[in-house]
Amino acid sequence: RDRHYIAYPKENVIKTWSEIKHAEKKPVTLWRYASTMLYFSGNEYYLTEFSSDWAKEAQMSTQPLLFGKKVIDTKLGSRAAMHTHPFFELGFEQPAQEAQGRAMLGTIGWTGNFQFTFEVDNVGNLRVIPAINPYASDYELKPNEVFTTPEFIFTFSNNGTGEASRNLHAWARNYQLKDGQGDRMTLLNNWENTYFKFNEELLAELMKEAKHLGVDMFLLDDGWFGNKHPRNSDNAGLGDWEVMRSKLPGGIPALVQSAKEAGVKFGIWIEPEMVNPKSELFEKHPDWAIQLPNRKTYYYRNQLVLDLSNPKVQDFVYLSL
């Protein structure tokens, strides 16, 4: 096993990962494979973690790390960060604070199931172990094949989490984000302003206000589609991607023209992988929605997921877009 480090002195950031290989005659199964292990000697450690849900993003909580193990993990797969963030803060001798005190910030470069383990031993030393979650993640490694773990990125600060977060911001702009140093487009989304209740005149006025604020793009959100089953609430219309004539008689071209006159770009929200049972699409093709036989159908926000493995569904989504 080889452990690798790359230091970014200007940003005060370190990136580390592990490579695992073997020379056995037959494949070896990997059951656990951490990106690294960091070891600290101190008197007190405080962990700050973040949890989320709809309308409850980034709920912060802090707790002391005492003897034993504390684990932050997720098993949600492609939705790994939905409830648990792959990010943490550590405070040394005191809870992590914005503008003072020793702090460490860390994150893992992995979009799937992850696991952070924090273990305080019997003499008060702390081990931090970031890794792919070992749950259902065994990997058969062939002889002389190299298995590379996700990268773990972390930074330290003697001046609180504010300085530490700016370290990571600078590192991301310089080394991680595409065009990180360039100007980034800003947009105004109408959702929190109007929800489903809008018309062409109101949207045109919002576009003018967006320009006045210095915003680059106006994004039209949910509620612009559906005729037989108008999308005036989240109960109907998903899947019927035709402009609602009663709400937007001029259609999308009229809105694009209003955006041009206001001097902003125009964007639009669409969720082509979802469908409401109360929609023309579902009435015509109920078999296109994913449902389990002999099970009561479960609805989340009154909608179902379309079966994108079905070529007919793929064609429908492509043509809709």
Task: Identify the residue ranges that each predicted region occupies.
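Short coil/turn motifs at secondary-structure junctions
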Residues: 23, 156-157, 273-275
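Short Pro-Gly-centered flexible turn/kink motifs
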Residues: 139-158
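Polysaccharide-binding surfaces and accessory modules of carbohydrate-active proteins
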Residues: 1-119, 135
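Hydrophobic beta-strand core residues of beta-sandwich domains
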Residues: 8, 141, 246-249
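Aromatic-lined carbohydrate-binding/catalytic grooves of carbohydrate-active enzymes
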Residues: 179-320
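Short acidic, Pro/Gly- and aromatic-enriched capping/linker segments at domain boundaries
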Residues: 122-142
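Residues within well-ordered beta-strands of beta-sheet-rich folds
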Residues: 17-21, 148, 265, 269
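Terminal connector regions
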Residues: 154-185, 192
